[in-house]
Amino acid sequence: MSGIKGTSQEYIGHHLYHLQFDLSTFSLVSSENTSSFWVLNVDSMFFSILLATLFLLIFGRLATVATYAVPTKLQVFIELVILFIDSNVKDMFHGKNKLIAPLSMTVFVWIFLMNTMDLFPIDLFPAIAKLLGLPALRVVPSADVNITSSLALNVFVLVMYYNIYVNGVHGFIKGLMYHPFNHPTCIPINFIIEVVSLLSKPVSLSLRLFGNMYSGELIFILISGLLPWWGQWVLNLPWAIFHILVVTLQAFIFMVLTVIYLSTAHDSC
């Protein structure tokens, strides 16, 4: 329990509090002491932006120095990732849209980087935050439902845009009314089913990623909070190895569902 003193309950609770900026008082607070609705989880925002910047810098730099002669190991690895994502997009998306592959690449790598923050020692960043005088700190952006909801909402906006762009407003509304049962008497039932199905996409997309990453982070915290330091490695190491699969798989699932939703949006009603 390095860096945080107190009982196991206090230790676990402390690691679940966000560093927030209270817009009503213009001050940094812990979510433990938040009494206002108008707050921002600045730790999640900071690390998500930091990782996005890191992603852009690495890929941008590689794009300018890439060579066919003697490629570096990093270049070979990134090219493999790009080819992997490109092949998956071609298998799932059959429309004509040059945005889908770069979008899928961005979604996968960004979410993967955010998920990877869960593999750092659980006390490392909170201990640094304590030295800096910060009341709390959480470093896994994808374990914050606000971040996952924002990602899912952006996907939903794109789905709605391409639905209307491909089919027009009339065609989009017609699709809600005459699918899955193509009969005028079924319009009310069709409309309810399609609207619920449409709205459930961003909800399930965000909660799936949030739930998996939050539970993974919570298990790390429980192991560190309930066991002595010399006994933590017995459970932490195998869980960390397994969690590498979870980190990658959740980023991949989010990307796949994004492509599928956008592919469906490009289908004519």
From Swiss-Prot:
The UniProt record lists the keyword Cell inner membrane: yes
GO biological process, one term: proton motive force-driven plasma membrane ATP synthesis
PROSITE patterns: ATPASE_A
Topology relative to the membrane: Multi-pass membrane protein
GO CC, alphabetical: plasma membrane; proton-transporting ATP synthase complex
Transmembrane segment boundaries: 39-59, 65-85, 108-128, 153-173, 187-207, 218-238, 240-260
GO MF assignments: proton-transporting ATP synthase activity, rotational mechanism
SUPFAM superfamilies from the UniProt entry: F1F0 ATP synthase subunit A
Annotated InterPro entries: ATP_syn_F0_a_bact/chloroplast (IPR045082), ATP_synth_F0_asu (IPR000568), ATP_synth_F0_asu_AS (IPR023011), F0_ATP_A_sf (IPR035908)
Localization (cell): Cell inner membrane
UniProt keyword Coiled coil, yes or no: no
Keyword terms, alphabetized: ATP synthesis, Cell inner membrane, Cell membrane, CF(0), Hydrogen ion transport, Ion transport, Membrane, Transmembrane, Transmembrane helix, Transport
Record family assignment: Belongs to the ATPase A chain family.
Subunit description: F-type ATPases have 2 components, CF(1) - the catalytic core - and CF(0) - the membrane proton channel. CF(1) has five subunits: alpha(3), beta(3), gamma(1), delta(1), epsilon(1). CF(0) has three main subunits: a(1), b(2) and c(9-12). The alpha and beta chains form an alternating ring which encloses part of the gamma chain. CF(1) is attached to CF(0) by a central stalk formed by the gamma and epsilon chains, while a peripheral stalk is formed by the delta and b chains.
NCBIfam families, per the entry: ATP_synt_6_or_A, PRK05815.1-1
Biological role stated in the UniProt entry: Key component of the proton channel; it plays a direct role in the translocation of protons across the membrane.
Full protein name: ATP synthase subunit a
Native source organism of the sequence: Blochmanniella pennsylvanica (strain BPEN)
Gene: atpB
